[in-house]
Amino acid sequence: MDIALKKKRLYGPDVHVIHREDRALAEKTYRRRPWLVRMAGRLLVRWETYIYSKLRDIPGIPELLTSPDPYTITTVFMGGHNLKKRLKTPDEAYFERLEALIKAIHDRGVIHLDMRNRRNYGMDDNGNPYIVDFASSVYLPLGGALKRMLCAIDWMGYLKVKAYLNPDLLSDTESKKTEMGNTLSLLWFFPRLLRFFRHLFQRILR
């Protein structure tokens, strides 16, 4: 039986666990959405597939698999739960491994840009971290001021999650960065842009 991983929305994908040949897979698909959302979803799937190809073989990144259609992206399901559910409080070892994972992602030139969302962080059955949902990511293989700024946004999002789930683990430096990140987030346009498009799709599809 398929298990939904995300609340269904008319303008968003279906995300659920499926089973194929005794293997649990995570499938994100727009195939059942209205035409306009389906076409936008096709572009998002193509982009996210490209990003996953840049992160191949990094522990904590789901393995990308062949998908049945251009509206769908399929990966290995990493198990466990996402941090939104708070089934288990992440400990210091978890966050240390998570920091190493984020650094590995950045070293490949990928910036996630939605690290404030606890649903994008996972904890597998062995307590190890993983990261999903790269649809809003950017790929900047070269260094420079823009990449440093966007990486800093990722780290601020990570610290916000850490502060929410286990604030006692924050160092003094991390606490100061968290406060600064909360202030700067008021100026960060990307979440507002996403909300704008969501409301736009809702109006169009009513």
PLM segments and residue spans:
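Short hydrophobic-acidic sequence motifs that mark active-site Asp/Glu residues
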Residues: V17, A24-K28, I61, T74, ...
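Catalytic-loop of the protein kinase fold
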Residues: D107-M123
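ATP-binding glycine-rich loop module of kinase domains
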Residues: D2-S53
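Conserved hydrophobic core/spine positions of the Hanks-type protein kinase catalytic domain
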Residues: A100-A104
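C-lobe/activation-segment region of protein kinase-like
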Residues: D124-R206
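Conserved hydrophobic "DFG−1" position in protein kinase catalytic cores
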Residues: V17-I18, T66, V76-F77, G122-M123
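Conserved structural core of kinase catalytic domains
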Residues: G41-R97
